[in-house]
A protein has these predicted regions:
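Membrane interfacial helix-start motif at the N-side
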Residues: 168-169, 180-192
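Conserved beta-strand segments of alpha/beta enzyme cores
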Residues: 23-25, 152-154
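A conserved acidic beta->alpha catalytic loop
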Residues: 2-11, 61-62
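Short, intrinsically disordered, charge-balanced linker/junction segments flanking boundaries
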Residues: 1, 72, 78, 190-192
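Alpha-helical transmission elements in cytosolic ATPase-linked domains
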Residues: 8, 12-15, 41, 70
Length: 192
């Protein structure tokens, strides 16, 4: 998904599609609609294509793509959802470590029982994608929804690699917005 990027993301997708990776499909947004909406668009597309499962991974090359085989093995063993769990936060600066820890702690305090240190790096079966498709809300919090499905799940630990190019666009404000979306779309605790 090219979420309205200003770099060469779309050009790379087009080039990959035409050469050795004809199976690569790309979706392009005209502007940045945000991480969750981009992921949902990609998952809806995969579901329409009739996939058995889908894996989401960030394009910044920090998540270990060699672990996808382990995700698929766990899927073949019967897991409907396989979470990518960061082994540690060594690659994060102090502020990112603190905000990451606070994010998961706060979300769980608010009643969104999410798996600590899992990112958007995950495998979802067709059954999990069908479950997601039943949600008609516009602001979905995927980390909460998938943890709440009751479907059989497992996890794969991975090391976060150093960022090769550029800086993360996921700022403290982005993390705050994600937490707010998670609380307002997934937790009833603030209403009590």
């Amino acid at each position: 998904i090219d979420d309205g990027s200003k770099d060469k993301t779309w050009e790379l997708i087009e080039n990959a599609h035409g050469v050795d990776f004809a199976h690569i499909k790309g979706l392009r947004f005209t502007k940045n609609y945000g991480n969750q909406k981009a992921l949902i668009a990609g998952l809806e597309y995969a579901l329409k294509k009739g996939v058995d499962c889908a894996v989401t991974i960030d394009a910044d090359l920090q998540q270990d793509e060699t672990k996808i085989e382990e995700f698929i093995n766990k899927f073949n063993e019967g897991s409907e959802i396989v979470y990518g769990i960061r082994k540690d936060r060594k690659s994060d600066n102090f502020i990112k470590k603190i905000t990451g820890y606070a994010f998961y702690k706060f979300m769980n305090l608010m009643g969104a029982n999410i798996v600590p240190n899992h990112s958007e790096y995950r495998l979802m079966s067709r059954k999990a994608l069908d479950t997601l498709a039943q949600y008609k809300e516009r602001n979905l919090f995927l980390r909460g929804i998938f943890c709440d499905t009751g479907l059989k799940s497992d996890y794969v630990e991975f090391d976060v690699k150093k960022r090769v190019h550029g800086d993360s666009k996921f700022s403290f404000l982005s993390l705050f917005k994600l937490a707010a979306e998670g609380i307002t779309s997934f937790s009833v605790r603030p209403l009590r």
